[in-house]
Amino acid sequence: MDERDALRISREIAGEVRKAIASMPLRERVKDVGMGKDGTPTKAADRVAEDAALEILRKERVTVVTEESGVLGEGDVFVALDPLDGTFNATRGIPVYSVSLCFSYSDKLKDAFFGYVYNLATGDEYYADSSGAYRNGERIEVSDAEELYCNAIIYYPDRKFPFKRMRIFGSAATELCFFADGSFDCFLDIRPGKMLRIYDAAAGVFIAEKAGGKVTELDGESLGNKKFDMQERLNIVAANEKLHPKLLELIK
């Protein structure tokens, strides 16, 4: 499998998931239909999104790590899949929820070769490969902000930081793409307990890095050794090369 195959598969999945979600009334999306492998309730919207995605991925020689079903398949290519990132938004009609896929030649993020995020509500498509990162087919880069008095997304605003604006959209994959295309200058998820799982963030991290961003753990360590595994959790500090060290110093 190469980048072209991954893009083809991702686009097919995005189309099918979007159709599945669009056909569901909001009152149906919100119903609990079981418990996911991650230990959280599965909404009807999650179930139909994952079913649509897995129907396509089962035709490929891949190992899939996904929120609801866990680890599936035994292929040489690993796929971190979140078929519906931003479930709450999807159940309320808030237009920030995405399908997210990251493809890797091993079970580690450092061997990823393709990332894909598709906003199911707006139709905006983000992907990255060896040539760079793209939004709706156009190259994107992170912002060139140099000062902390900047726009930021932060999940743990208990302390007073000198940011001009803070936003929380409820979809890490989409938010990392907002960082990647320069809409926001930073992305931080510094919640205690490392609430993000690998399938939440892998594609967004890959896209952000290919757009020129620096993305690390709280201690500045690379995310490259994070595994495509249900137990893998992470915090994220993402900014451009100039802002990143300032953010790390600030949140110590």
UniProtKB/Swiss-Prot annotation:
The entry describes its oligomerization and partners as: Homodimer.
The protein's Enzyme Commission number: 3.1.3.11, 3.1.3.25
Cofactor binding description:
Magnesium. Can also use manganese.
Organism encoding this protein: Archaeoglobus fulgidus (strain ATCC 49558 / DSM 4304 / JCM 9628 / NBRC 100126 / VC-16)
Characterize the regulation of its activity: Both FBPase and IMPase activities are inhibited by Ca(2+). In contrast to mammalian I-1-P phosphatases, is only very weakly inhibited by Li(+) (with an IC(50) of about 290 mM).
The upper taxonomy is: Archaea, Methanobacteriati, Methanobacteriota, Archaeoglobi, Archaeoglobales
Binding positions (Mg(2+) 2): 82, 85, 200
Q: Which family does it belong to?
A: Belongs to the inositol monophosphatase superfamily. FBPase class 4 family.
Q: Which N-terminal residues, if any, form the signal peptide?
A: none
Specify the protein name.
Fructose-1,6-bisphosphatase/inositol-1-monophosphatase
Annotated residues that bind Mg(2+) 1 are located at 67, 82, 84
Provide the binding site for substrate: 85-87, 167, 172, 191
Chain's role: Phosphatase with broad specificity; it can dephosphorylate fructose 1,6-bisphosphate, both D and L isomers of inositol-1-phosphate (I-1-P), 2'-AMP, pNPP, inositol-2-phosphate, beta-glycerol phosphate, and alpha-D-glucose-1-phosphate. Cannot hydrolyze glucose-6-phosphate and fructose-6-phosphate. May be involved in the biosynthesis of a unique osmolyte, di-myo-inositol 1,1-phosphate.
GO BP annotations, alphabetical order: inositol metabolic process; phosphatidylinositol phosphate biosynthetic process; signal transduction
Q: Which residues bind Mg(2+) 3?
A: 38, 40, 67
**Which cofactor is essential here?**
Mg(2+); Mn(2+)
Q: What class of enzyme is it?
A: hydrolase
